[in-house]
């Protein structure tokens, strides 16, 4: 198995071309993935195969689409105040599937805390509340999405009081005790699962693309029955394979791991 996990941020909107708009980039990238004959599969399917030791049951190369932060642009067509109408990821996936007659799927990793999301929207989105949870259940029901866990509050500097014992923010490496990890991982998963029951809630994407040694070496592997998480993803570029560490899985982020369609083509072929 060679699994390439691609990550987009639907709120990365500084224009309306590939370089400045992750929604535009996603639409183009789906076409390229299809042209290369690489199937797009749910991330949970890849994780299940990895854990079961059944990676050989998947096609030789597969791709998975992930989205970070859970902005409304993932599911709702919106008008951006500076860049105009934007097709949501849902609309992009539907159009792609209809055009090619193949399934498309994405896992959106969302921030659980409603209060944290409100503060992030107020400070980072000109108070446009584009980071709600009203669409999570509908996203799962559409068959196009799983809703995964991106922590309780992202340890975002935009949140006045993050759930970290010393109030530290800006790096998920600060999560290095059971109490903090339990809230950021378990409580977040349980909130998401209550809002939108789905297989993706058992997947965790570390905020800022980084975990801590405590999470990777102790909390995730030793407390699985409590936190209910099956795998954790970083933002480190790379390819998943049968020997990958399930608590330190790679993802390739649009705008850093690749910046152009040609970059992505090389990444997919390597």
Please give the residue ranges for each predicted region.
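C-terminal active-site subregion of NodB/CE4 polysaccharide deacetylases
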Residues: 1-66, 71-77, 157-270
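Generic hydrophobic/packing signal
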Residues: 4, 40, 93, 105-109, ...
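Aromatic- and glycine-enriched glycan-recognition loops and surfaces
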Residues: 20-32, 80-91, 126-134
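Active-site cradle of extracellular carbohydrate-active enzymes
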Residues: 108-166, 170-171, 177-178
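Acidic (Asp/Glu)-rich catalytic clusters
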Residues: 34, 54-57, 93-103, 128-149, ...
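Proline-centered loop/turn at the N-terminus of a beta-strand
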Residues: 62, 105-107, 146, 231
């Amino acid at each position: 198995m060679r699994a390439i996990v691609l990550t987009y941020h639907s709120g990365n909107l500084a224009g309306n071309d590939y370089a400045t708009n992750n929604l535009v980039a996603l639409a183009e990238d789906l076409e390229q993935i299809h042209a290369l004959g690489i199937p797009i599969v749910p991330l949970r399917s890849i994780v299940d195969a990895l854990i079961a030791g059944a990676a050989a049951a998947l096609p030789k190369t597969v791709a998975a689409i992930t989205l970070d932060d859970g902005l409304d642009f993932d599911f709702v067509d919106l008008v951006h105040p500076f860049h105009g109408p934007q097709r949501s990821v849902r609309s992009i996936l539907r159009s792609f599937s209809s055009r090619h007659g193949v399934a498309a799927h994405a896992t959106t990793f969302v921030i659980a805390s409603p209060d944290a999301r409100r503060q992030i929207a107020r400070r980072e989105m000109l108070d446009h509340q584009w980071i709600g949870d009203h669409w999570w259940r509908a996203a799962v029901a559409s068959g196009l999405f799983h809703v995964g866990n991106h922590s309780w509050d992202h340890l975002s500097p935009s949140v006045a009081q993050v759930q970290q014992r010393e109030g530290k923010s800006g790096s998920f490496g600060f999560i290095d005790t059971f109490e903090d990890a339990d809230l950021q991982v378990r409580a977040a998963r349980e909130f998401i699962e209550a809002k939108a029951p789905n297989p993706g809630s058992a997947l965790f994407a570390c905020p800022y693309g980084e975990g801590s040694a405590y999470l990777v070496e102790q909390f995730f592997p030793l407390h699985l029955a409590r936190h209910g998480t099956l795998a954790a993803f970083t933002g480190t570029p790379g390819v998943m394979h049968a020997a990958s560490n399930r608590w330190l899985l790679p993802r390739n982020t649009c705008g850093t791991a690749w910046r152009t369609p040609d970059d992505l083509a090389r990444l997919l072929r390597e």
